[in-house]
Amino acid sequence: MNNPVASPDIDPIDRLTILAAALPGAAVRQRQITAPFDAVWRVVADLEQATPRYEPSVAHVRVIERRGELLRLLVEDTAGREEIMDAKLRPGWCLMQSATVVVAFAARPLGSQTLLAHLEHRRVRAPLPSQSGSHHHRAAEEKIDQELQTIERLAIEGEK
């Protein structure tokens, strides 16, 4: 079976765009980061140490199982709730998902810089009647923009 999201021949940013199209309501943002790909990807791939530094709702991440590119994570949020996530991690591509959320990163070199895309999607979000879907989506995009800025700062600091 041809799975376009799994194909290694597809540019990772394009792969993330395909994934976003399959997840209605997913928030996706991109940022051109003024750091080389290796420095940026080192931050993204350091799930245990870096994730709590750029993701405000995450307190701890622990890799509890690793089989090549496939990982099982135990993620604790800032309220103390734990959730198991399955992840696929390889250079330029990180997909993490649980029963409630899908999170993905895609990156590619852009000269001496990096193009980094980030997707977040809640699987079980039922909007309240008084809640504006577009307001929630804008807030999610603003949150992702902040996360991408923090990843850029961490990548630049790591290069020093």
Protein language model regions, located:
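Hydrophobic ligand-binding cavity/cleft-lining segments
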Residues: 1-65
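Short, hydrophobic/aromatic-rich segments at coil-to-beta transitions
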Residues: 3, 49, 66-73, 88-96
